[in-house]
Curated annotation (Swiss-Prot):
Entry's family note: Belongs to the tRNA pseudouridine synthase TruA family.
Keywords of this entry: Isomerase, tRNA processing
Quaternary structure, from the entry: Homodimer.
Function: Formation of pseudouridine at positions 38, 39 and 40 in the anticodon stem and loop of transfer RNAs.
Gene Ontology molecular function, alphabetical: RNA binding; tRNA pseudouridine(38-40) synthase activity
Gene name linked to the record: truA
GO BP, sorted A to Z: tRNA pseudouridine synthesis
Species of the source: Helicobacter acinonychis (strain Sheeba)
Catalyzed chemical reaction(s): uridine(38/39/40) in tRNA = pseudouridine(38/39/40) in tRNA
InterPro entries: PsdUridine_synth_cat_dom_sf (IPR020103), PsdUridine_synth_TruA (IPR001406), PsdUridine_synth_TruA_a/b_dom (IPR020097), PsdUridine_synth_TruA_C (IPR020095), TruA/RsuA/RluB/E/F_N (IPR020094)
Residues the record lists as binding substrate: 107
Claim: Magnesium is one of the keywords in the record: no
Protein name per the record: tRNA pseudouridine synthase A
Keyword set includes Nuclease: no
Active site: 51
Amino acid sequence: MRCFKATIAYDGAYFLGYAKQPDKLGVQDKIESALNLLGIKSVVIAAGRTDKGVHANNQVLSFHAQKHWSADKLFYYLAPKLAPHIVLKKLEEKNFHARFDAQKRAYRYLLTKSLKTPFLAPYIACGDYGSLDSLNTALKQFIGKHDFSMFKKEGGAATNPKRIIFNAFAYKASIMGHECVVFKIIGDAFLRSSVRLIMQACVQYSLEKITLAEIKTQINNIKATIRTPIMANGLYLHRVHY
């Protein structure tokens, strides 16, 4: 058997998350089904499991296929079976593990105060976010190594809640004709819904609904103030570093 590394982008609006679902509506379901049509029966491992409605620009996968498959040949036959909501961007033969070999994951979150068209609603979150300075003040609190037990939803395969955030910041950008705030956060890995809970905490602080002390208290696992993640539709798994 040969091990392959695939880089894909997908529209999270059409799936119930990355992981397999009972009704076969997960990204993993779609990919494994497409491989099965080619006679390839393999579990597909992802660098990160995204929630329902979360998108990916550069999700990385690893899986195995028979030796008669070259990367070029497999790309040719697999890409059309994933389209249109999953795009196979790159495929190469590589002996690695998509999840365990990943060193950093980078996420981006797009937020605008108002949408000019409903057709962008699945891809840009809409809501007030206060000031850019306040958002960056809050984001800085998360940089470093922390126990994120109070910044995760129940479930998921992770047993160690400690994670390292290498960088987290926000900036303004014009995206598809909309003035947006773009959050960027880079960590070694993230717990279930952790990124969205962090984004929610930062927005609520910027809107003066919670204090910086309350964020620190939650980071230190003393008391949880933020329990509901921010909307999923603005979140993108942007890049995975190996």
